Amino acid sequence: MRHRHGLRKLNRTSSHRQAMFRNMANALLRHEVIKTTLPKAKELRRVVEPMITLGKKPSLANRRLAFDRLRDREIVVKLFDELGPRYATRNGGYLRILKFGFRDGDNAPMALVELLDRPEAEVAEQEAVAA
């Protein structure tokens, strides 16, 4: 039986996995959309969603917990000042994982991971006005 086998190992050591998901979480929180393989995307959801939930309660202890996991001050500031208030009324489910075809070379299933409620329409309008 495959009960209680927690996470995907992804053919990596635990330190490599931890560093990879830290980097992927930072990239996702910075750019709000990333492209990766489907198994990594599903595992990344388990890392990022608790971080956003942490960002909804801005206390010093929560900031320190977030910094301990992300190790990037700029991202921690964005998490608590921008993303926490954005998702204040949403109870979980902050990410969308879209299947994105297959990668050339090894045919790995790819996925697009994005934060919900991104303010992309305003950015597109500002770029159109600037051009």
Curated annotation (Swiss-Prot):
Disulfide bonds: none annotated. It comes from the Bacteria. Pfam families: Ribosomal_L17 (PF01196). SUPFAM superfamilies: Prokaryotic ribosomal protein L17. GO terms for cellular component: cytosolic large ribosomal subunit. Keywords: Ribonucleoprotein, Ribosomal protein. GO terms for molecular function: structural constituent of ribosome. GO terms for biological process: translation. The keyword Ribonucleoprotein applies. PANTHER family: LARGE RIBOSOMAL SUBUNIT PROTEIN BL17M, RIBOSOMAL PROTEIN L17. Belongs to the bacterial ribosomal protein bL17 family. Part of the 50S ribosomal subunit. Contacts protein L32. HAMAP family: Ribosomal_bL17. This is Large ribosomal subunit protein bL17. The lineage of its organism: Bacteria, Pseudomonadati, Pseudomonadota, Betaproteobacteria, Rhodocyclales.
